[in-house]
C-alpha cells in the first residue's frame, strides 16, 4: 500500500473492507495529494449496520422470515446482513415468539451437510469479537437474550444464532457492526412510527442496506422518503440482503462507503476521464468578429 499510495502515477483505488481501514487509506492519500499527477479516484465499500423496520400493518410471518434469513444466512457474515430490527408493539409478542421458534429449528454443523442452516464463523478472531458482544449484552440490564447466546470453539468456531431484545434503542449491539449471527431488536410504540424512523436514521453511522415491512402503502412511501439517506439498497417487504450483481446495483453511503454501486455501469463512470475534442473545419482568418466591423 505504501508503495502505491506514494507513487506519482497513483490514479485510484477500489476498496472493499472495513470502514476503519478505508478511513486510514483516505487519510494517507490526502497527505500524499501533492505527489500525484492527477487527483485519484477513491471508491469504498465498507461496513454496515443493516436494519429491518416493521410497521404496525406488517404481516408478522413476513417480518419473521425476513429476520431469520436476513440476519442468519452465512452466519450474518456479510455486510448486508440484518443486524438491528424495530418491531411495533402491536405485533411484537407474535414476532418474538415465532422468531425464537424459527431460530431453534436451525440446524448447525459443517458445510458438507447442506441441511445445516448455520455453520462455523470464519476464524478465531471473528469468533472472539462476536462472543464479546454477546457477553456484553448478557451483562447489560437493559438487554435480554431471547434465544441463543452460546459459543463453542472446541472444534471449529461455532456461535449460536442469537436474538437480543433491548430496552435501549442505542445500545451497543444496535449501533456497532458485529459481522456475526447476532440480531438485536427494539420494540417501539406502534402509534409512533415517525419516532421509529428517526431512530433508524440516526442510531448507526452506516447506511448500506435496510428494509421496510408493511402492508400500508402510505407507510411504505413515507419510510422510503424519510430513510433515503439511511440505506443505499432499500428493500420493501423483503430481507435487506441478496442484491444480484448486474441487476441490483449495490452500495451505501455515510460510513458504509462512497455508494458507487458495484456491479453496475454506474461504478464504471467513476473510472472514466472524459475528454472533449473540438475540430474546426472552417477556421477563421481574421481576429475581428463581425460585430467589431459594425458602424
How should these model regions be labeled?
Residues 181:
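Glycine-rich nucleotide-phosphate-binding loops and adjacent flexible coil segments
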Residues 174:
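Short, solvent-exposed loop/beta-turn-alpha elements that line the ligand-binding surface or hinge
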Residues 6-8, 12, 18-169, 190-194, ...:
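ALDH superfamily catalytic-core signature
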Residues 184-186:
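Active-site donor-binding acidic/aromatic loop of nucleotide-activated sugar
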Amino acid at each position: 500500500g505504501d508503495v502505491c499510495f506514494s507513487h506519482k502515477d497513483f490514479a485510484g483505488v477500489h476498496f472493499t473492507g472495513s470502514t476503519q481501514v478505508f478511513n486510514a487509506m483516505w487519510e494517507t492519500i490526502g497527505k500524499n495529494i501533492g505527489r500525484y499527477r492527477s487527483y485519484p479516484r477513491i471508491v469504498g465499500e465498507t461496513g454496515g449496520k443493516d436494519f429491518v423496520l416493521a410497521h404496525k400493518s406488517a404481516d408478522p410471518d413476513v417480518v419473521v422470515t425476513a429476520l431469520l434469513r436476513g440476519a442468519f444466512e452465512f452466519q450474518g457474515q456479510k455486510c448486508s446482513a440484518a443486524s438491528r430490527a424495530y418491531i411495533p408493539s402491536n405485533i411484537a409478542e407474535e414476532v418474538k415468539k415465532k422468531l425464537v421458534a424459527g431460530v431453534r429449528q436451525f440446524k448447525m454443523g459443517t458445510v458438507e451437510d447442506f441441511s445445516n442452516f448455520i455453520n462455523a464463523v470464519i476464524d478465531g478472531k471473528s469468533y472472539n469479537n462476536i462472543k464479546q458482544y454477546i457477553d456484553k449484552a448478557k451483562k447489560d440490564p437493559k438487554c435480554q437474550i431471547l434465544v441463543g447466546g452460546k459459543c463453542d470453539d472446541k472444534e471449529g468456531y461455532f456461535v449460536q444464532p442469537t436474538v437480543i431484545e433491548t430496552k435501549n434503542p442505542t445500545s451497543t449491539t444496535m449501533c456497532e457492526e458485529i459481522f456475526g449471527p447476532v440480531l438485536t431488536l427494539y420494540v417501539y410504540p406502534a402509534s409512533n412510527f415517525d419516532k421509529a424512523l428517526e431512530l433508524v436514521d440516526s442510531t448507526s453511522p452506516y447506511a448500506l442496506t435496510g428494509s421496510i415491512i408493511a402492508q400500508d402503502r402510505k407507510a411504505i412511501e413515507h419510510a422510503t422518503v424519510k430513510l433515503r439517506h439511511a440505506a443505499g439498497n432499500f428493500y420493501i417487504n423483503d430481507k435487506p440482503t441478496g442484491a444480484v450483481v448486474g441487476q441490483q446495483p449495490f452500495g451505501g453511503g455515510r460510513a458504509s462507503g462512497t455508494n458507487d454501486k458495484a456491479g453496475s455501469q454506474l461504478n464504471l463512470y467513476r473510472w472514466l476521464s472524459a475528454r472533449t475534442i473540438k475540430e474546426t473545419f472552417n477556421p477563421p482568418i481574421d481576429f475581428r468578429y463581425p460585430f467589431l466591423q459594425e458602424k
